[in-house]
Swiss-Prot record:
Keywords: NAD, Oxidoreductase
Quaternary structure, from the entry: Homotetramer.
HAMAP family: IolG
Assigned EC number: 1.1.1.18
Family note: Belongs to the Gfo/Idh/MocA family.
GO molecular function: inositol 2-dehydrogenase (NAD+) activity; nucleotide binding
InterPro entries referenced in this protein's UniProt entry, alphabetically: Gfo-Idh-MocA_inositol_DH, Gfo/Idh/MocA-like_OxRdtase_N, GFO_IDH_MocA-like_dom, MI/DCI_dehydrogenase, NAD(P)-bd_dom_sf
Source superkingdom: Bacteria
SUPFAM superfamilies according to UniProt: Glyceraldehyde-3-phosphate dehydrogenase-like, C-terminal domain, NAD(P)-binding Rossmann-fold domains
Protein name: Inositol 2-dehydrogenase
Protein role: Involved in the oxidation of myo-inositol (MI) to 2-keto-myo-inositol (2KMI or 2-inosose).
Pfam families: GFO_IDH_MocA, GFO_IDH_MocA_C3
Source species: Beutenbergia cavernae (strain ATCC BAA-8 / DSM 12333 / CCUG 43141 / JCM 11478 / NBRC 16432 / NCIMB 13614 / HKI 0122)
Length: 360
């Protein structure tokens, strides 16, 4: 079976997914696209013979579309995701699932009403070979339990439209989900620290900043977010265990040593660094849909994959992000956020709704 895929948002990340589905992966074909920029939609659709739709809901409703991939701006995710669930069609949604935790709850409610999981979130680090190897060491238990995690997320530059809060909601959200998945537990509280900012930023940006997470069992995670680092796209993670340390390797094929010294290439962006992970994630989703599943690895395709994410994961990440944004607001304002939710140390508790049985 060839899965007929409709893509909402075929620019940037969406275009990268179209290219991988068309040129690298098996079992899927992009047959429909929708973009608010109709010129771009036609530019992308014409070479692959896809149909251009005037709205996301029209695309989702089409009998020619089996499954939907949503890669539009995060503020526009909710409508096509809810439409896909209502139509009983599997949907792979890039992060975030929706702009707010309340909207993520709408998606979960729709899935619960439908009685099946149809939504997969694009948290590709769960499919990255380095993160998978790190999780295997932790889960194996040979080095004891996790105590601390040190994360670094550095980008070459951020566009002017990148707001201070996006360091949490658009960038650190990947670390937030990766830590929930890696450590196998929820995050209990969040704190944001800010200090000196780089000169290489737009004036409204706070860069770098540090996000501190504490899990239910007490594991401390520090996340450095530096989106105007200039030198490249650099994601690092060090897991401190009771009798050892596990770190992500340098993401290079080769290292070079010559008269000028030793060096290796730094990746340029997320598509460069996580290309293989993106491929594995999307292939997993296509294969699950082809096998009769809804969410990746769910349903007729077999047991749910340990790497595949759900609407619950999208919701949980959104709640943590909301807490981080409140902490940042308190730090910048120098006072409580007005709702009594920030303690004297700047920590904001994370309060999750009861997990529906569908996501157990």
């Amino acid at each position: 079976m060839t899965v007929r895929i409709g893509v909402v948002g075929p620019g940037g990340m969406g275009r990268a997914h179209i290219d991988r589905i068309t040129g690298e992966l098996a079992g899927g074909a992009v047959v429909a696209v929708h973009d608010i920029d109709e010129v771009n939609a036609r530019r992308v659709a014409e070479p692959i013979g896809a149909k251009v739709f005037g709205s996301a809901t029209e695309l989702v409703a089409s009998d020619a579309v089996d499954a939907v991939l949503v890669a539009s701006d995060g503020t526009a995710h909710l409508e096509p995701v809810l439409a896909a669930v209502a139509a009983g069609k599997p949907v792979l949604c890039e992060k975030p699932l929706a702009p707010t935790a309340a909207e993520c709850e709408q998606v979960m409610a729709a899935e619960v009403a439908a009685g099946r999981r149809l939504v997969t979130i694009g948290f590709m680090r769960r499919f990255d070979a380095s993160y998978l190897a790190m999780k295997a060491v932790l889960d194996g238990g040979e080095l004891g339990e996790a105590l601390l995690v040190h994360c670094r997320h550095r980008n070459p530059s951020a566009r002017e439209a990148y707001r201070a809060t996006m360091a949490i909601t658009d960038t650190a959200i990947h670390e937030i989900d990766a830590m929930r998945w890696l450590l196998g537990e929820e995050i209990a509280r969040v704190r944001v620290d800010v200090g000196k900012s780089t000169r290489n930023r737009f004036g409204h940006q706070i860069d770098p900043l540090t996000l501190l997470l504490e899990t239910i069992s007490g594991v401390r995670v520090d996340v450095e977010v530096f989106v105007n680092a200039r030198y490249g796209y650099d994601v690092q993670c060090e897991l401190v265990l009771e009798t050892g340390v596990v770190s992500l390797g340098d993401q290079s094929v080769v290292s070079r040593r010559d008269a000028s010294g030793a060096r290796h290439r730094i990746t340029s962006d997320h598509n460069d660094r996580f290309h293989a992970a993106f491929n594995a994630e999307v292939q997993h989703w296509i294969s699950a849909v082809a096998a009769g599943g809804g969410a990746a690895g769910d349903g007729a395709g077999g047991a749910a994959s340990a790497s595949a994410s759900t609407a619950w994961d999208g919701y949980a990440a959104a709640v943590v992000c909301d807490a981080g944004v409140r902490s940042l607001a308190a730090v910048l304002g120098g006072e409580d956020d007005g709702a009594g939710r920030v303690d004297a140390g700047g920590w904001v508790p994370v309060s999750l709704a009861q997990r529906p049985a569908l996501y157990a």
